[in-house]
Amino acid sequence: MAKASTTTTINPAEAAHFGKLAADWWDPTGSSAMLHKLNPVRLRFIRAAIDAHWPGHKGSFRPLIGRSALDVGCGAGLLCEPLARLGADVTGVDAAPENVAAAQHHAEGSGLAIAYRCADVAAMDGQFDLVTSMEVIEHVTDPAAFIAALADRLAPSGLMILSTPNRTGKSKLAMITVAEGLGAIPKGTHDWDKFLTPDELTPLLEAAGLRIGMVRGIAFSASGGLHLSDDLSLNYILTATPA
């Protein structure tokens, strides 16, 4: 895999924006309400990907027992806690100290031992069996360097899972014009010009020595809400493994 630069990919303005949301991150009716609706959809994909990659524990309540997981851009721990419940030894990393503090507080209240760090993934050491980063790459200063840093943290037989909005007319309408315009997502959360299409993300993964596996869209319908789909035009989630 490509060796990542130690140059930071953190955007201080983005970190500050998300840090302001830390206090009610775990409130399903607060500023992160959309994440609470999105998280179960992500988890369905993540569980299927885990079962496909490590079939020995398929169907188990704790398929990640004995494995390490790193969630990059973890916020207040909305994904870290389910990964811990699946048995993983979890580390969560975020650029906003407010998020790390909120994550630590919630994990302690939930009786979960999760290692949270306010850090840049490019400056970390060690490797992990599972590396996840949900809706983060569109907020960094250098997507290629960010992917390379994630790849450096991935164990040779590990699994990476990424999700990000697609840069389409539909995503601009749904996520910025409508969702941010109506207050369903805090204003300023997204910069549509920084969204990556699958055709743009693929060569970044390949340059970092990774091969794409499963790819699904996350779509929305009035009847079904957010759900996994073959339609990648709004948001997509994928797996990658060392080539």
Task: Name what the model sees in each region.
Residues D193-G209, V215:
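Short alpha-helix
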